């Protein structure tokens, strides 16, 4: 099993212009190219395991993909083809859930699978509403776990679905299915989750309206009557990936980082605002706004204090493990609630965060929907990543104040292939098998 050791770091100042491209937008760019009848041009596509798996699935569905160093050109098929083999989503819940929605209205038979971690994640939250409108989806655990076998239906019923949870993946899957339904459809959620799907599809010409109604965020979708316009997009840097280095600057004394060309979508920068609330100096500089607002984020070290986080959880669900590291060195108590979704991510992130913090000498306890962390002095420890890229990267960042060894780090490649290269610019990194 591979491992990485990092030594305690001194202060640093760093400008990072090559944060990994945004994973959410990369997935969607590849998928949504299938909704046009003209080639889509994608610059700065994330070349990580998860998104490359999505690109391979797009090829298997009939698209031609031309790749160069700077851009990807995707030529969609005249109609999506039934693949000859199983579609492998790797570690990506986004890939599996969104492809279920995309393929629900396509005539054909499709089998979606993934790695051992993805095959244990719940899929009924997408499969059940799709079944209710006419798609045939089955799988392990009564259709709740992959591999999933899907037979599309070109006669999907119109629907009005009230999601019990705020989930960008559930919402996006249903929006994609709605584009091929027989009539207008609506999806609502109790809070606004990430809205890349709505923004990008509207930018491609889809008739999608978003608004608040009776305390719920609502998306109204008119089915397609013609192919959408092709994408011409340069994918910004991923704020979820950038946030690891924001935490690094916040916890390392006399440190500062400039994170360039990040998407500043309000549903993606909530964790930075929490870090700001904890006492870190955080500045947002917007530079452009087409499909998404894009700009720079500057984070400078300052003394941190505890914080309670219970609102807008869907906006920072992926950043909570890294935020837990800031909480661990902050003065006082921090509490995270309403984050039960952490238990069904790539790992049970509530248990993994709490148990690993305890190894580092930090007082922490689990709740069913979150945890409590008492800030203190981090100690060096041997950490198990739980096969989860965000756990691995979070505790490597923790090593900046104490030194740390993190085991099973291959998972980092699923989202942030150059993470260790960037980390080595601010701290000594030792890799081993």
From Swiss-Prot:
Pfam short name (any one): EPSP_synthase
Compartment(s) where it occurs, according to its Swiss-Prot or TrEMBL record: Cytoplasm
Keyword Chaperone among record annotations: no
InterPro entries, sorted: Enolpyruvate_Tfrase_dom, Enolpyruvate_Tfrase_sf, EPSP_synthase, EPSP_synthase_CS, RNA3'P_cycl/enolpyr_Trfase_a/b
Top-rank lineage group of the source organism: Bacteria
Enzyme Commission code(s) on record: 2.5.1.19
A molecular function (GO) term: 3-phosphoshikimate 1-carboxyvinyltransferase activity
Keywords carried by this UniProt record: Amino-acid biosynthesis, Aromatic amino acid biosynthesis, Cytoplasm, Transferase
Biological process according to GO: amino acid biosynthetic process; aromatic amino acid family biosynthetic process; chorismate biosynthetic process
Transmembrane segment boundaries: none
Gene3D superfamilies: Enolpyruvate transferase domain (3.65.10.10)
Annotated residues for binding of 3-phosphoshikimate: 23-24, 28, 167, 169, 318, 345
Pathway the protein acts in: Metabolic intermediate biosynthesis; chorismate biosynthesis; chorismate from D-erythrose 4-phosphate and phosphoenolpyruvate: step 6/7
Task of the protein: Catalyzes the transfer of the enolpyruvyl moiety of phosphoenolpyruvate (PEP) to the 5-hydroxyl of shikimate-3-phosphate (S3P) to produce enolpyruvyl shikimate-3-phosphate and inorganic phosphate.
Protein name per UniProt: 3-phosphoshikimate 1-carboxyvinyltransferase
């Amino acid at each position: 099993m591979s491992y990485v050791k990092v030594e305690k770091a001194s202060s640093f100042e760093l400008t990072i212009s090559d944060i990994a491209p945004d994973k959410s937008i990369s997935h969607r760019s590849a998928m949504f190219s299938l909704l046009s009848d003209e080639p889509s041009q994608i610059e700065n596509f994330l070349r990580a395991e998860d998104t490359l798996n999505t690109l391979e699935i797009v090829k298997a569905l009939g698209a031609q993909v031309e790749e160069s160093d700077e851009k990807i050109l995707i030529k969609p098929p005249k109609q999506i083809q039934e693949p000859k083999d199983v579609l492998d989503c790797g570690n990506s819940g986004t890939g599996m859930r969104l492809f279920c929605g995309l393929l629900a209205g396509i005539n054909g038979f499709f089998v979606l699978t993934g790695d051992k971690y993805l095959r244990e994640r719940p899929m009924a939250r997408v499969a059940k509403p799709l079944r209710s409108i006419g798609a045939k989806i089955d799988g392990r655990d009564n259709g709740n776990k992959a591999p999933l076998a899907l037979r599309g239906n070109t006669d999907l019923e119109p629907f009005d679905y009230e999601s019990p949870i705020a989930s960008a993946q559930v919402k996006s899957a249903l929006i994609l299915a709605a584009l091929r339904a027989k009539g207008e459809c609506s999806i609502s959620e109790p809070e606004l989750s990430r809205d890349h799907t709505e923004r990008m599809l509207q930018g491609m010409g889809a008739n999608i309206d978003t608004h608040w109604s009776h305390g719920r965020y609502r998306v109204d979708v008119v089915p397609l009557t013609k192919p959408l316009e092709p994408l011409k997009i340069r994918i910004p840097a991923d704020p979820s990936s950038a946030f690891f280095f924001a935490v690094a600057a916040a916890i390392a004394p006399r440190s500062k980082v400039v994170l360039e060309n990040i998407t500043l979508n309000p549903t993606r920068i909530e964790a930075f605002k929490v870090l700001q609330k904890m006492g870190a100096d955080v500045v947002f500089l917007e530079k452009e706004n087409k499909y998404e607002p894009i700009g720079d984020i500057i984070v400078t070290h300052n003394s941190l204090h505890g914080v309670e986080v219970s609102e807008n959880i869907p906006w920072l669900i992926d950043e909570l493990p890294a935020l837990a590291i800031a909480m661990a060195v902050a003065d006082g108590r921090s509490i995270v609630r309403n984050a039960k979704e952490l238990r069904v991510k790539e790992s049970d992130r509530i248990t993994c965060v709490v148990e690993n913090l305890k190894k580092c000498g930090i007082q922490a306890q689990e709740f069913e929907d979150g945890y409590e962390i008492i800030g203190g002095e981090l100690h060096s420890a041997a950490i198990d990543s739980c096969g989860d890229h965000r756990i691995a990267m979070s505790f490597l960042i923790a090593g900046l104040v104490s030194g740390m060894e993190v085991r099973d780090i291959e998972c980092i490649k699923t989202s942030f292939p150059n993470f260790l290269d960037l980390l080595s610019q601010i701290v000594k990194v030792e890799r081993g098998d």
